[in-house]
């Protein structure tokens, strides 16, 4: 069987529709979302409600705490274990979410062709200790494409990218793009007309504020430092600036909406890279028809 990945831009309406389908076909949901993976970050990541999660079992939501390290490689390891467990139990695994790097980790895997060089890794690590930021500068120089994908604080992946470059003379970003897409997966992208999608984004942000996003951020800052990677994401970074009196709440809300719209555009651009993906525009068909088409896509052999 082929495994189904259902994706689409934020606020397109994936959760609502997939929940209904999953309950009809004995499916569980494996979240493909790099923010919903965090515990305590509920409102700002638009997690499914307790009621929604009670209807269908979800995995990789509330998986780690905000100060724990996690990346696409770890996601792949966890997701494949869960996938195989569900298949053995006769349950359909549905991968649902819009984090591009996580989707890539499933359909393309990771380049692992260069053996580890512990001596080189130690030397690079020492360089970073003596001159913080030097590895980032080197990566931007030798492999700018990889630098765009790797977070500045992700020293492990930075060292790996530099290790590959120094051992082979080739950029890890080029070697990764040469890998073929797995035939084990099929991708379905849900979309909407832009004006409708952006209106849904705006309404969802307003809903987050009403549900207590500001208090959620305050509570998080009582437990964790503000500079965690998890807090440098849309919805959290803007509210943190508001709490620091950098700007007022109206400005923070405006920026969350604006930044979310920009993020949705980037997601759409990323998803267009998957030439084999099927697209369904939810603005053009009824909910009933959409559910029929999605269910048919999932169950196709």
Curated annotation (Swiss-Prot):
Annotated keywords: ATP-binding, Magnesium, Nucleotide-binding, Transferase, tRNA processing
Record-linked SUPFAM superfamilies: P-loop containing nucleoside triphosphate hydrolases
Stretch list, region Interaction with substrate tRNA: 33-36
MF annotations from Gene Ontology: ATP binding; tRNA dimethylallyltransferase activity
Catalysed transformations (reactions): adenosine(37) in tRNA + dimethylallyl diphosphate = N(6)-dimethylallyladenosine(37) in tRNA + diphosphate
Top-level EC class: transferase
Site label Interaction with substrate tRNA, positions: 99, 121
Function: Catalyzes the transfer of a dimethylallyl group onto the adenine at position 37 in tRNAs that read codons beginning with uridine, leading to the formation of N6-(dimethylallyl)adenosine (i(6)A).
Family assignment from sequence similarity: Belongs to the IPP transferase family.
Identification of the protein by name: tRNA dimethylallyltransferase
């Amino acid at each position: 069987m082929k495994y189904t990945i259902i994706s689409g831009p934020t606020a397109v309406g994936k959760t609502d529709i997939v929940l209904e389908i999953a309950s009809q076909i004995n499916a569980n949901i494996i979240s493909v979302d790099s923010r919903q993976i965090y515990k305590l970050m509920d409102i700002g990541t638009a997690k499914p409600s307790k009621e929604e999660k009670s209807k269908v079992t979800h995995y990789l939501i509330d998986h780690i705490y905000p100060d724990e390290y996690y990346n696409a490689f770890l996601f792949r390891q966890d997701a494949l274990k869960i996938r195989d467990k569900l298949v053995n139990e006769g349950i359909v695994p549905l991968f649902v979410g819009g984090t591009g790097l996580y989707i890539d980790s499933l359909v393309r895997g990771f380049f692992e062709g260069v053996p580890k060089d512990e001596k080189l890794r130690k030397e690079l690590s020492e360089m970073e200790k003596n001159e913080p930021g030097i590895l980032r500068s080197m990566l931007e120089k030798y492999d700018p494409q990889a630098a765009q994908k790797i977070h500045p604080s992700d020293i492990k992946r930075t060292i790996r990218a530099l290790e590959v470059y120094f051992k082979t003379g080739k950029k890890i970003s080029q070697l990764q793009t040469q890998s073929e897409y797995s035939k084990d997966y099929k991708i379905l992208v849900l979309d909407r007309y832009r004006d409708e999608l952006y209106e849904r984004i705006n309404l969802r942000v307003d809903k987050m504020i009403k549900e207590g996003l500001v208090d959620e951020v305050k509570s998080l800052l009582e437990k964790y430092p503000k500079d965690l990677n998890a807090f440098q994401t849309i919805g959290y970074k803007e509210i943190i600036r508001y709490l620091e009196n950098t700007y007022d709440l109206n400005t923070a809300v405006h920026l969350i909406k604006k930044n979310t719209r920009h993020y949705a555009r980037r997601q759409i651009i990323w998803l267009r890279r998957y030439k084999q993906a099927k697209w369904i525009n939810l603005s053009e068909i009824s909910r009933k028809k959409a559910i029929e088409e999605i269910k048919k896509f999932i169950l196709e052999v």
